[in-house]
Amino acid sequence: MSSMPNHQKVVLVGDGAVGSSYAFAMAQQGIAEEFVIVDVVKDRTKGDALDLEDAQAFTAPKKIYSGEYSDCKDADLVVITAGAPQKPGESRLDLVNKNLNILSSIVKPVVDSGFDGIFLVAANPVDILTYATWKFSGFPKDRVIGSGTSLDSSRLRVALGKQFNVDPRSVDAYIMGEHGDSEFAAYSTATIGTRPVRDVAKEQGVSDEDLAKLEDGVRNKAYDIINLKGATFYGIGTALMRISKAILRDENAVLPVGAYMDGQYGLNDIYIGTPAVIGGTGLKQIIESPLSADELKKMQDSAATLKKVLNDGLAELENK
């Protein structure tokens, strides 16, 4: 942690499209007084630092620079976006073996620097890589957080906002489970202005089939974006900024993140997307949603899918 009072330091590892979008979002919001960018492509990190520096006159003063893993020593937060990108036709789980190797080369030097803050992981497959970060680092589980279903939940709220012509910020709805193909919309707990989404839907002639189609569109939106422009980055960059803000400002905000399961939903020893309280010490509390029987089965099936891929990936890494 930074030794200066009220001086917060963030280190970003990975300056690709997602990382640079996150850095821009942090600069725009004026969050953290010191922001370090680490990547194997040094010219890019130096260029981004110089470019972001130019925004300070319009936002807030901030020390922004290209750095090394040693700069993590006194950081409050290390955000990992580094990894091989998802290609058209490739699932997030297809990325596991490539990105486990990359992650193992990142976490060790961060920890060796003396870092004692919070890890926030966004590289895909994020649930598996968050678990691996926890394992590789030896950190307490509450100080290793994944972006989880934060982006997916935003997509759901935007889609429901469009469907019912309301501000998506007035929609309280969560995508849960894997950040990927086995995720699901927890419609049983979703509300619009305190009213259950299913009640609002019924009044407006929106059927369960329509809601299922909307959910499927949310699940596949990443693939639509990837097919059109090659990658997703603005949405996830903003989601990471929101989680970072909750941590650095000790907000105790309820956000959908990748959290370690210790009996919740009947699950153990896995990171998966769920609402949780996020603040200055990391993940403070998991909000165990009262899911329907069908949704609980989807949550457990999603976890089983993740656990199999996780175990296979870690076993392969150990055998190398």
UniProtKB/Swiss-Prot annotation:
SUPFAM superfamilies: LDH C-terminal domain-like, NAD(P)-binding Rossmann-fold domains. NAD(+) binds at residues 18, 39, 44, 69, 83-84, 105, 122-124, 147. The active site is at 179 (proton acceptor). One of its GO terms (cellular component) is cytoplasm. Its main location: cytoplasm. It catalyses: (S)-lactate + NAD(+) = pyruvate + NADH + H(+). Its EC number is 1.1.1.27. The keyword Phosphoprotein applies. Pathway: Fermentation; pyruvate fermentation to lactate; (S)-lactate from pyruvate: step 1/1. It comes from the Bacteria. GO terms for molecular function: L-lactate dehydrogenase activity. Belongs to the LDH/MDH superfamily. LDH family. Catalyzes the conversion of lactate to pyruvate. PANTHER family: L-2-HYDROXYCARBOXYLATE DEHYDROGENASE (NAD(P)(+)), L-LACTATE DEHYDROGENASE. Homotetramer. NCBIfam families: L-LDH-NAD, PRK00066.1. This is L-lactate dehydrogenase 1. The lineage of its organism: Bacteria, Bacillati, Bacillota, Bacilli, Lactobacillales.
